[in-house]
């Protein structure tokens, strides 16, 4: 996959996620893939790009982070889309020069999308996010789980970090009641209803 193809994939994902989780309300942005060593992604609060008289905000996805499972990358994209939503709707979502994410703005809007869950970090506030089951299911419906956006793929290099499962999503099933959950990493999990350890479903 060329970097232009990776960018095009993220642009198409932006449109699909906007329609699914934001009601199609978000204006277009420019998607970039650039080095971002200290962050998974970044959103510019001003019009960083111009075409004629039209200005566009930018969402950057860190090039170093593209070897993560697709649900985590999409979670990052949604995170930055929440910043975009807050900006265009005049919702104060951060403080401390944009580093601290607050609960009344960012957390409320982010979890209101139904796409990501928000955790708390005392240094940066309600910034850490993770994909919900709804987002993971949507990714599977779109057929995105097998997409490889890693630098090795973009540069045409062999191999990678070997995460073990190509789509990054694992399904755990209770052997008794057959209740299931999805996770983006290996976990030890049990069914409280049956008191049984849930088993990894092999694909």
PLM region spans:
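Active-site recognition of the HExxH zinc-binding catalytic motif
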Residues: 75-88
